[in-house]
Amino acid sequence: MKFKIFAVIPFASLPLHVFSAEPVETADTTHWLGGVTVTAIKQNDDLSLQPLAATVIRENTVENRQITSLRRISELAPNFFVPDYGSKITSSIYVRGIGSRMENSAVGMTVDNVPFLNKNAYDFNMSDIDRIEVLRGPQSTLYGRNTMGGQINIYTIKPMDYQGDRVRASIGNGPTAWMSVAHYQKFNPDLAMSFSGNFNLSEGFYKNYYNARKSGDEKGGGLRWTTQWQISPSVSADNTAAWNYNQQSGYEYMLEGSKYINYNDTCFYRRNVFSDALTVKWNTARFSLSSITSFQHITDNMTLDQDFLPLNYFTLTQAIHESAVTQDVVMRGHTGIYSWLGGVFGFYKSTSMRAPVTFGDDGIARLITDRINNNDRIPVRLQFDSPSILLNDDFKIKTGGVAVYHQSNLDFGRFNIGVGLRLDYESTSLDYVSACNTAFSAFMKSGIPPTPILQKEIVIDDKGKLSDHFLEFVPKFTVSYDLPMHSGSSLYASVGKGYKSGGYNNQMFSEILQQRMQQEMMSAMPGMQAPDSPIDVDEIISYKPERSWNYEVGAHIGCAQGRVMTDIALYYIDLRDQQITTFPDGTTTTGRITTNAGKSRSYGAELQIRYRPTWHWNFTASYGYTNAKFREYKDGDADYAGNYVPYAPQHTLFASLAYSHKIGSRWCLTYDMSLRGAGKMYWNEANDASQSFYAVPSAAVTADRGWIELEAWVNNFTGTTYKTFYFESIGNRFYQRAKPRQFGLTLRLNFNSSAE
């Protein structure tokens, strides 16, 4: 009997025939049992007829599209956009008009069923990937907090399924290079292990005009050790330990109107991530029970020339040490027409963060003292005793939570009805220390020679603690109908709630410290009075949770004996308190802030097509349309109702056409052309800065002999220019331009002993 566990939950809401973008299917690209993978725990292994919108990217596509990081997935799925800018800390993801540049992500991610709680670690070096699932729409019922935009599930190749050695090496202009090596071995029928490593390097593509050095160079690497043990016929254990390291210098940001990157202070990002996860499964005839226990530790340091000018304005450092543990217990079973899944999830995360801001002489003058020194009505001139000022902020952030969730599914012939429920509790606390120790002198502007009339030391040592907690009920409802067609097809409708937790704007503490310092200065000046109202720290740095309701209808249609597969989805999203990143007004503000818009809405459509008339030809395409606008949003000065939500593209497009033919009895040549596109997107709430729609073509030729593949490729061969990012700092506008034309060679070696 066939049992279907519906995405009643926001978990695998995939559209039908799990869209796959591979141009050529080979026997060893993925490993199936009866046509169905057996690695997923929270969702039905066969996602092809589930009542949700999703894209599955299989191993062959991962390699042919050179997916070695999260950013390369962008546009492969409709309305799924990951801009390529900044460093690996960025990991901004936008789905259906929902996204996040700072703090909590709007899209969750798991690797081999283990959740990543910090989006700082999302963009890691990928290697030996079996498949990637991109689920669109709220997945909060199964996957919990911060998945209101969707969920990414990544599954790696396992040593029980594949034995042998794999080598991947790629080199391109820049120069850039990437390599991975893996060994998979089964010691006996019950025990298998794999060891893999990878590294990458790039010298970047653009020079910093200030020092004539390339900006944006990077290097990194990773190790992974997986052990699989079949303890008994019904009990198995899987443990994976992984380490990733990345180091990047510079940021390729340039002043709007300029043709050059031109800043003077050091910029870099360094990150170490270690994780270990143990999964234990117990399978019986009536139910299965799984336990997933994980630990993750992140150490990183981001240092920026925050003004990105050849001036000594100010630099910012954000360095964290974070440890997190998670525990998920999942039970699922079936009785007749009834299928069910239930679980308990808990997590705890402890973060220590240093976030000092250092003002240089230009920053002191233009952001602080010029306010007084250039005011003719004030007879005094200020001068700090040191050429720099350190504003030091230290934080200890503790976050924990627990959730219970359940989904039920009833199968009435062709009709399927599902209900998912989740109760999620989270608590968070922030201990902060904001300190500054400096001194200044005041001089009469008319005094000759200048003689100080006042010398004042400023010592600030503010300490405090903030805390909050959130309790959220997250339901989802689905109904689907299996069409009477030979190729599996279905119609579905779903209603689900999305939820993203609230938090604190840590970067705004430097703004608060500046205000405190200016208050101290004003109170010391004769005839001047500082504001007597205290600064409400909680009011300034806190932001509320974001909530949404997603209404969706879709269809999964298979035609021509499965040679044509089409997925269609229409959706409407009602959002309350949408979290958006803004830049405080003025030419003296230095930070970014996450704030809540009152109300917004998003609606759109998605289309995926795969057509394979013969094994020679393969055509795939995906298109997404999003119309996301504010319904109510005032920032105190302006009313943005009716404006587009920033950073989310209105259109995404991907298309590929591949042709394969054999040469002799052993070689196969594949010619592939593809196109990615996105836009229009607005860069701010005022909608006065934007990037029009752009399209980037790529091409590749692959020679495949089974155990060896050689590919020649070129990305962006038209040299299309466009902006990948925009931001404002101290009244200036900056942007990052896209990478230029890239080309290179990739070698793949497969020594598959399990096929012998």
Show the residue positions of the predicted features:
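N-terminal periplasmic accessory domains that precede
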Residues: L70-I73, S92-G97, T110, V134, ...
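Extracytoplasmic beta-strand/coil segments of soluble accessory domains associated
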Residues: R71, E75-V114
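Short acidic/polar hinge/loop motifs at secondary-structure boundaries
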Residues: D112-P138
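Transmembrane beta-barrel wall of Gram-negative outer-membrane proteins
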Residues: G164-R166, I171-S202, Y206, Y210-Q248, ...
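Solvent-exposed loop segments that connect transmembrane elements
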Residues: K207-Y210, Y251-N262, D307-F314, P356-N392, ...
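Membrane-embedded beta-barrel scaffold of Gram-negative outer-membrane proteins
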Residues: T279-L304, S490-G496, Q507, L513-T595, ...
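Gram-negative outer-membrane beta-barrel transporters
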Residues: I337-L341, F347, D411-F415, Y425-E426, ...
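C-terminal beta-signal and adjacent terminal beta-strands/loops
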Residues: L341, T351, Y499, L675-N684, ...
